[in-house]
Amino acid sequence: MSKLWGGRFTEEAEAWVEEFGASISFDQQLVNQDIKGSIAHVTMLAKQGIVTKEEAEKIKIGLQYLLEEAKQNKLHFSIEAEDIHLNIEKMLIEKIGEVGGKLHTGRSRNDQVATDMHLYLKEKVEHIIKATKQLQTVLVHQAENNIETIMPGYTHLQRAQPISFAHHILAYFWMLERDVNRYEDSLKRINISPLGAGALAGTTFPIDREYSAELLGFNGIYENSLDAVSDRDFILEFLSNSSMLMMHLSRFCEELILWSSQEFQFIEMSDQYATGSSIMPQKKNPDMAELIRGKTGRVYGNLFSLLTVMKGLPLAYNKDLQEDKEGMFDTVKTVEGCLHIMAGMLETMTVNKEKMGQAVTQDFSNATEIADYLANKGLPFRQAHEIVGKLVLHCTQKGIYLLDVPLETYKEMSPLFEEDLYEVLSPYEAVKRRNSAGGTGFEQIKNALEKAKGLTKEVIKN
């Protein structure tokens, strides 16, 4: 077939060259955005008198027909037409005649594709924000049910201090809240229109960029036409934000994987989110958590890939920019899927409160309580730290724990020890007393839950 841009050429490309250069296999995902952008563009052309109202109406009817066909997956795309833009224009001309060729007046594929991607990401980021909020509501629900569930808190994956399981869960709530904030802030840069920037220098036609931007729901326009068609920082920002979100999901999944093991037994995954072994009948594998952890690297790769594509590109458009889409599409699909799986996995998991409680009674995670006890009685903390270190050494040599040490032994270490010491050694009391702002104390957790509910109330309402 003859190309819509073929006037300059005397030879046709080989079929394999066409296939190599075509992007329709993946950019057809922009079909709805491409048609909606074209409807806004031709509406603006008619308003400005660049095309007649009759021509615009005919073009819009043709585009609306194609949009309905697209929604029903009835459009058939061809590699010969290269990309989504030329495929739609070709179909439009076939449907309404040569007047369809006027659609591209005052526009280039360069600003057209940028517009499509802005529209696409605006919609998808809003979906991801909503899905993240839904995951946060699951975290709130689990935290409410586990305020007084005591577990070890860890540093270096070694038991450190007793904490509330709700406190641990809410740590991820606040990480996700920052992810939501980053996505929301990015919408300010996504929600601007490149349409009308042309190939790179604008156009000689008296277009109204603000009007077409308004029709598409954008908050403004790019101020520089070169910038509008050549940068993909809005996609990079999306990929970066998604990488951080996936990092948070991956860290949580790593803990869920550990906690579901026989060595921990803190939780059990629902059968819906686990698989078995083809050879070992006893196995229950946390495959969904492992997949989320694994897919995090995939999202990182999409970010690094586009950064590498962009780093050496001169202004303005270069064909390299065709490589901006597949990673974006893949990241959207990956993030949406991971958020959905994560919410279901956390909602259906069983928490083994007894095992968590046992883990903080047969260890030394209450050692800091003794140091604080001595410091509260006026002993410098560093001296208190040394005394408790000797006590822990004594216990490990005797094969006992701090609760097993008789008061006489404590008094040999320091005369400041009294009978009330054993109260502070209780893991429950240790957690309860940590009532500083943002701490693991039960009252602080209740305060944090109220704030968290306030941030997710719209999701709960819907």
Curated annotation (Swiss-Prot):
Top-level class of the enzyme under EC nomenclature: lyase
Keywords: Amino-acid biosynthesis, Arginine biosynthesis, Cytoplasm, Lyase
Cellular compartment(s): Cytoplasm
Keyword Acetylation: no
Catalytic activity line of the entry: 2-(N(omega)-L-arginino)succinate = fumarate + L-arginine
InterPro entries: Arg_succ_lyase_C, Argininosuccinate_lyase, Fumarase/histidase_N, Fumarate_lyase_CS, Fumarate_lyase_fam, Fumarate_lyase_N, L-Aspartase-like
Main location: cytoplasm
A single GO molecular function term of this UniProt record: argininosuccinate lyase activity
EC number in record: 4.3.2.1
GO CC term (a single one): cytosol
HAMAP family attached to this UniProt entry: Arg_succ_lyase
PANTHER family named in the record: ARGININOSUCCINATE LYASE
Family: Belongs to the lyase 1 family. Argininosuccinate lyase subfamily.
Protein name: Argininosuccinate lyase
Gene assigned in the entry: argH
